[in-house]
Regions:
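OB-fold and OB-like single-stranded nucleic-acid-recognition modules
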Residues: 21-175
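Positively charged n-region of N-terminal signal peptides that target proteins for export
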Residues: 1-7
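Sec-dependent N-terminal signal peptides of Gram-positive bacterial secreted proteins and lipoproteins
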Residues: 7-22
Length: 175
């Protein structure tokens, strides 16, 4: 009976411990095994990550809206990421805010690891997402007469390093 009572008390205290630990965490380091899940969690619960340091490796990617405004992002490619309703591959990451030079995207539409890779440290600018209206594509990869809205959080970059040896990084991430 005492063992059962101790287990019950432990189970009741576990959520408090988890909440207490996660609220006090000041930084997140996304790596190959955590990138997709943590990035997805950030997209759903951005308020939990504002003012927390986030470190991650990504490649640069331009998103152009229907008015030809460009957004330079730091992303990874994934299947059915946050906000994806099409069931096709998409990208997950942030719009980058940085005072210095950011490498131009390289092979962003190609299924290759040969990209413009960067190592970033920074924080979410806010929990507000930027809505970007983009052209939709048909099954053949041609621009259709439809548009769709994608949403990205903005990331204030405090440190950026170019990654020259990206052999241990995967442009495509999943669960």
């Amino acid at each position: 009976m005492i063992k059962m009572k101790n287990k019950l008390i432990s189970l009741m205290l576990l959520p408090l411990l988890v909440v207490g630990c996660s609220n006090g965490q000041k930084s997140y380091v996304l790596n190959e095994s955590t990138f997709f899940l943590v990035m997805t969690n950030i997209q759903y619960y951005p308020e939990e990550y504002v003012n927390k340091d986030i470190t991650y490796d990504c490649f640069t990617y331009n998103i152009k809206d229907v008015n030809n405004k460009e957004y330079l992002c730091g992303v990874r490619k994934c299947t059915a990421g946050f906000g994806c309703r099409c069931g096709k591959d998409t990208v997950i990451g942030f719009i980058l805010n940085y005072e210095g030079d950011i490498p131009e995207p390289k092979n962003q539409y190609e299924d290759t690891n040969d990209k413009a890779w960067i190592h970033l440290v920074g924080q979410l600018a806010s929990e507000t997402k930027t809505k970007i209206e983009i052209n939709s594509y048909d099954a053949n990869g041609n621009i259709s007469d439809q548009t769709e809205i994608v949403e990205f959080l903005s990331f204030n970059v405090s440190s950026l390093e170019t990654i020259t040896d990206y052999s241990n990084l995967a442009y495509f991430v999943s669960k």
